């Protein structure tokens, strides 16, 4: 915040580091700083923001310092959507991703939003996953049963479910619909 404010107040030179890595603490992360200057103040630094995620992964790999999956701008799970209400929102906004997200994923080299399945998932989350497997005619009670199992297994696992786990649940609930 101090670095962004310094530029807003006229500073022409600032020091930042990729992912904020460096000696001690308090280094301004380049990605967050550049993106804030661009989106909040309209200041184009000339830095290619589409490389941010790639560079952050490279720096994490070379430095051995792992970055949190939920790290702002470059986190691997930044565009994962687990919450059922947000999954519904993402489904309904189409290409207008600036409604549920502060910036488009391609601006920082991220992939498009991905609906994931976990304890916070909702009916639309399950319906989206079913649709991805060609099941578009599931009844509400079937989706509810699948959702209950998704939530239970996610809580037991303490994490998100993968495609194999989801299909296992679907086979149990609606066995005649999955190969």
Features from the language model and the residues they span:
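Short hydrophobic/aromatic-rich motifs at helix boundaries and adjacent loops
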Residues: 5-6, 30, 97-101
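Glycine-rich phosphate-binding active-site loops on the catalytic face of alpha/beta enzymes
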Residues: 9-26
């Amino acid at each position: 915040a101090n670095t962004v404010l310094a530029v807003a107040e006229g500073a022409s030179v600032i020091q930042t580091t990729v992912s904020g890595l460096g000696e001690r603490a308090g280094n301004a992360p380049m990605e967050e700083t550049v993106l804030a200057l661009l989106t909040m103040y309209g200041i184009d630094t000339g830095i290619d923001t589409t490389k941010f995620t790639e560079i952050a992964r490279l720096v994490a790999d070379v430095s051995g310092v792992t970055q949190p999956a939920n790290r702002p701008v470059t986190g691997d799970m930044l565009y994962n959507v687990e919450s059922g209400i947000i999954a519904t929102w993402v489904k309904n906004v189409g290409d207008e991703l600036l409604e549920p997200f502060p910036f488009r994923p391609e601006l920082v080299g991220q992939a498009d939003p991905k609906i994931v399945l976990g304890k916070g998932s909702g009916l639309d989350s399950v319906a989206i996953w079913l649709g991805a497997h060609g099941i578009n005619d599931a009844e509400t009670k079937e989706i509810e049963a699948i959702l209950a199992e998704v939530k239970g297994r996610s809580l037991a696992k303490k994490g998100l479910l993968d495609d194999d786990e989801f299909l296992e649940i679907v086979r149990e609930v609606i066995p005649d619909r999955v190969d």
